[in-house]
């Protein structure tokens, strides 16, 4: 079989946990073509494998249209269409999509089309699905798991509005006043290290505000770029050549 994922980071995680090679969808299904006067594009390739199973992790990220993971530079611009066409162009090949319906859908989508049976059936596919309910990454007594399970159940019930979040001053999930945030972050950075502390926000705008505040008030860095800063690659370069000594994938840090 062949392991795939929408992003380089997801492919690395897949490969690490599965113990087998995994690649980005784009790397496997597209091939580079150069057109005179039009620059370089990537056309859909042909699946030469026979009777192979393609396992795609993080399938909730796969878009059904241009934008997000869909890009007019690649094939038809609709990643999901291209993926299905590629896989089933090979003799006897099958597709297994693995993902979490509770995660955020692709940009511009109300839900994750690659995880919907009715959407997949429109391609003329015989579709089977199953929900995995046993949690193996966290303790069954975890406050974080309890909160996540509550939110998932509310989503399944069609709940609308602001969901309740249960907190415990001495537990894993605590309500923290804004004026105590900086002090708490400083303590966590000192105790666990910067790589093990994550601030999650509801928007990119809010994330930038937090990042700038943490950078200036906790790490005392005012310049745009200083020594020991973490730099993240936010866009893949599909024109990379072997002349480069080292490359970074999207979302990787250096």
Predicted segments, located by residue:
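Conserved helicase motor core of P-loop NTPases
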Residues: 78, 86-93, 101-253
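ASCE P-loop NTPase helicase motor core
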Residues: 1-161
